[in-house]
Amino acid sequence: MKPSEIREMSIEEIDAKIRELRLQLAKERGMLTMGTSLENPMVIRNLRRDIARLLTIKKEKLREMGKK
């Protein structure tokens, strides 16, 4: 997910996307702990980075709203 795409989203949409990605991350980690090999081991890393990106841009937006 690109930062420009995230910046176009509203805060509510960002929150929904964060919940969705965290759920997907929990499922992937669960599969890993059960011994199932992942199709693409980079999935977990990419999910974590997407969540961090979403949280960062959400904080930026909230800061902007506070200044206005």
From Swiss-Prot:
Q: Which residues cross the membrane?
A: none
**What keywords sit in the KW lines?**
Ribonucleoprotein, Ribosomal protein
Coiled-coil ranges from the UniProt annotation: none
Q: Name one GO biological process term.
A: translation
- The lineage's top-level taxon is Archaea
Please give the positions of the paired cysteines in each disulfide bond: none
One GO cellular-component annotation of the UniProt record comes to: ribosome
Q: Listed GO molecular functions?
A: structural constituent of ribosome
NCBIfam families registered for this protein in UniProt:
L29
The name under which this protein is listed is Large ribosomal subunit protein uL29
Q: Which organism is it from?
A: Pyrococcus horikoshii (strain ATCC 700860 / DSM 12428 / JCM 9974 / NBRC 100139 / OT-3)
